[in-house]
């Protein structure tokens, strides 16, 4: 769920919805290793013989000190995990999974063949009964950094941590359809959920004590009410709630769900609890300021990670089967397109994070007592794994790592890595001054100019700083609500679609100018509602590829290749008039003079441009609004200084149009955003054909088939006129040219394959 705090953090058109395999996905950077076909042998030989030397300094935004492969949450903490762990399976530069890691898979990217290796092989078999089996085999030469061998028991232990009913990290393996998983998890619940569902007036203390019940409800009535009241007050401040007693209005604006009129702050807190299964750490996502952990007692907070058996005990997950010291199978009840991505999970050492005396596979004991992850939680300050580097210490904002001589793809070429907390303002000057070797400044035209000034010349390669750009794993868009922008109250009618396409056609024409002005060559205009970094994104060379909203109401192309900008703007307006007329508007002499019943002559698009026009899409919208004004139609661009107001406006369903951005995961599943039952289908799109395509794409693992389905689905979305894809921006990594051997940096970096993916091969000058 989105909240005001998240909205503020994401207001700068970076991302609205973050989807990731946090806690396990990031470690994939150490799960697959790659070398170009032309020098793979030489690289492999060098990596096993070269001596580690020197210290490499990396800039990090800030640590939370949760250095655990199971519980790391912040990006910087996850970076530490990436470098100290290996994942079971990895992905290539396109985000596609590498299933033959032991022998390696060769795949082409940007004209170069790269061979990817990893810790394991995985054979996926779709069975006749509808189940799917994942046959996993580990390399037999893997070692943890302390010299202990990596076996399938470590994998099984790690899986059971992620699947435990009390696990409250950010990985979501527990949501997959593994055979027997529901029975395993449902045979135990958390103490917090049990007490909450029993109710404050409960008199049956069979499963918990009266003292525990009283402590829980005392915490709810005190800290819980304060937590909810902060949300209400925040909504009152932004105008989304009437007053301090308007819990119902605030719950709706905060996207928590519905509460009846007269509901209290306590009712709101109980709604939040129900939304998150009374997992207090998960409920922290809804904070309006104060952490829930600061409002309720520590012992009560721990109730949400305390397991209680209910019903018949189920000691194991039937779908997880050990077949050898280095092999296992995992079986799901049905095909799940996301299951394979969950296998990017880290392989954590049982002997370090668990209790070896409690591991007995044959007797359903997996390294800890079910419902008790205390031994795992106790190891969050010093990670151990089989990754490129070993953790030394964390002190004064710096994480110190040492080269792992046992790393399966060869010992790193640098002896030490210091990961240093760095302010944004120092990420460039630090590299210039020589105190930082690699950093990731927020990239913009101003940053590019600053680097050019330091280097004395423009370009990616300079004498002081070398820059490497890659596409950001997300995109910016402009949306229209089908519920609020339609003709005659029917969002799905052809007239309603034509109305929205009339508006979008004009806005689309001004994207190039607006994005070039804001980003220069650090962003590109996109034409389909998907990040260009996804394997499912249509390519310009694909059959049927089209510029978004570039045809008129009769399906004819609006533009020609020799058109100048002004000609394109005029052509877009002419096409818009055709759409308006088809929607039922009265059009005469190039002017719109009247709207049909249930439609208007004016609509509004909300944009979070800080109240001063600072947004990539602001110029695009204002230019389009000015153009539409010339034909008698008013498009109001509402620049909202308070990001929470923007997010509340469309999450509550009130906005007619808005501007935001999505971030994508490896898997391009569209259910959440575009299915009629999707939780974040703010467009209110409801199309049977689209729903069927989305579900069909979930029912196959054939990427070519899925890509075709997704393209057809995206064409339906565009035909509804509810979304205009606008831009794909770049993000940068900068290197000290003087300190880092630039020739040893990973080539062809992508969001799925960064310089850290091959950090063991990087050398210092």
Describe each region flagged by the PLM.
Residues 405-452:
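Ligand-site clamp/hinge motif
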Residues 400-402, 494-626, 763-764:
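Append "and occasionally in soluble cytosolic enzymes with long acidic Gly/Pro-rich linkers
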Residues 93-96, 280-318, 324-327, 332-336, ...:
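Gly/Pro-rich hinge or "lid" segments in bacterial periplasmic/extracellular proteins
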Residues 218-222, 226-227, 233-268, 285, ...:
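Extracytoplasmic/peripheral linker and loop segments enriched in polar/acidic and small residues
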Residues 59-129:
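N-terminal lobe/hinge region of extracytoplasmic solute-binding protein
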Residues 171-184, 188-198, 462-464, 471-474, ...:
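Acidic-aromatic pocket-rim loops
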Residues 735-765:
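Long beta-strand-rich cores associated with HINT superfamily self-processing modules
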Residues 58, 147, 431, 436-441, ...:
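Periplasmic binding protein-like
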């Amino acid at each position: 769920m989105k909240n005001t705090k998240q909205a503020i953090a994401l207001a700068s058109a970076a991302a609205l919805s973050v989807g990731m395999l946090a806690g396990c996905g990031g470690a994939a950077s150490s799960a697959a290793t790659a070398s170009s076909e032309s020098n793979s042998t030489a690289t492999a030989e060098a990596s096993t013989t070269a001596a580690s030397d020197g210290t490499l300094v990396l800039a990090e935004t800030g640590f939370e000190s949760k250095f655990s492969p199971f519980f790391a949450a912040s990006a910087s903490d996850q970076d530490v995990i990436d470098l100290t762990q290996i994942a079971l399976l990895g992905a290539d530069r396109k985000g596609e999974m590498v299933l033959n890691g032991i022998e390696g898979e060769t795949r082409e990217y940007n004209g170069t063949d790269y061979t990817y290796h990893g810790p394991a092989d995985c054979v996926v078999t779709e069975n006749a009964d509808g189940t799917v089996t994942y046959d996993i085999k580990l390399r037999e030469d893997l070692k943890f950094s302390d010299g202990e061998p990596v076996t399938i028991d470590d994998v099984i232990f790690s899986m059971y941590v992620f699947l435990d009913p009390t696990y409250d990290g950010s990985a979501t393996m527990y949501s997959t359809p593994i055979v027997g998983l529901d029975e395993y998890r449902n045979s135990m619940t958390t103490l917090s959920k049990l007490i909450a569902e029993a109710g404050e007036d409960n008199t049956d203390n069979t499963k918990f004590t009266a003292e525990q019940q009283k402590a829980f409800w005392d915490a709810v009535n005190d800290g819980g009410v304060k937590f909810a009241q902060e949300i209400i007050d925040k909504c009152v401040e932004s105008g989304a709630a009437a007053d301090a007693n308007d819990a119902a209005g605030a719950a709706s604006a905060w996207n928590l769900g519905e509460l009846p009129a007269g509901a209290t702050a306590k009712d709101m807190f109980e709604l939040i609890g129900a939304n998150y299964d009374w997992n207090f750490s998960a409920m922290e996502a809804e904070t309006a300021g104060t952490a829930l952990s600061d409002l309720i007692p520590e012992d009560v907070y721990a109730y949400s990670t305390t397991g209680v058996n209910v019903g018949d005990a189920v000691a194991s997950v039937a779908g997880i089967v050990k077949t050898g010291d280095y092999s296992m199978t995992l079986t799901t009840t049905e095909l799940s397109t996301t299951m394979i991505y969950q296998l990017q999970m880290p392989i954590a050492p049982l002997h370090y994070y668990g209790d070896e005396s409690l591991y007995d596979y044959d007797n359903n004991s997996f390294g800890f007592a079910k419902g008790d992850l205390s031994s795992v939680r106790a190891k969050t300050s010093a990670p151990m794994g089989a990754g490129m580097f070993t953790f030394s210490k964390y002190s004064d904002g710096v994480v110190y790592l040492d080269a792992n001589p046992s790393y399966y793809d060869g010992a790193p070429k640098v002896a030490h890595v210091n990961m240093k907390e760095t302010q944004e303002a120092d990420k460039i000057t630090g590299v210039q001054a020589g105190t930082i070797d690699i950093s990731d400044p927020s990239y913009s035209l101003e940053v590019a100019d600053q680097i050019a000034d330091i280097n004395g010349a423009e370009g990616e390669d300079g004498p002081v700083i070398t820059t490497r750009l890659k596409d950001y794993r997300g995109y910016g868009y402009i949306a229209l609500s089908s519920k609020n922008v339609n003709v005659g109250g029917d969002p799905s009618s052809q007239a309603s679609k034509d109305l929205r396409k009339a508006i979008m056609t004009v806005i689309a024409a001004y994207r190039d100018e607006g994005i070039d002005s804001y980003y220069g060559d650090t962003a590109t205009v996109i034409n389909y509602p998907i990040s260009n970094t996804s394997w499912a994104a249509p390519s310009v060379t694909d059959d049927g590829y089209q510029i978004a909203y570039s045809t008129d109401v009769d399906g004819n192309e609006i533009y020609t290749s020799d058109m100048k900008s002004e000609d394109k703007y005029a052509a877009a307006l002419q096409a818009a008039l055709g759409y308006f007329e088809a929607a039922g508007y009265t059009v005469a002499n190039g002017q719109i003079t009247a709207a049909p019943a249930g439609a208007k002559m004016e609509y509004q698009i909300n944009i979070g441009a800080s109240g001063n026009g600072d947004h990539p899409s602001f110029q695009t919208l204002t230019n389009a609004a000015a153009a539409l004004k010339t034909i008698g139609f008013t498009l109001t661009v509402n620049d909202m200084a308070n990001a929470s107001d923007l997010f509340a406006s469309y999450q509550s369903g009130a906005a007619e149009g808005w501007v935001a951005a999505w971030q994508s995961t490896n898997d391009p599943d569209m259910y959440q955003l575009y299915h009629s039952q999707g939780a974040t289908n703010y467009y209110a799109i409801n199309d049977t054909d689209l729903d069927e395509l989305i579900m069909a794409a979930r029912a196959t693992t054939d990427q070519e088939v899925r890509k075709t389905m997704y393209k057809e689905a995206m064409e339906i979305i565009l035909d509804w006129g509810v979304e205009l894809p606008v831009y794909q921006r770049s993000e940068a990594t900068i290197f000290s040219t003087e300190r880092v051997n630039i020739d040893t940096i990973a080539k062809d970096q992508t969001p799925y394959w960064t310089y850290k993916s091959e950090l063991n091969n990087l050398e210092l000058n």
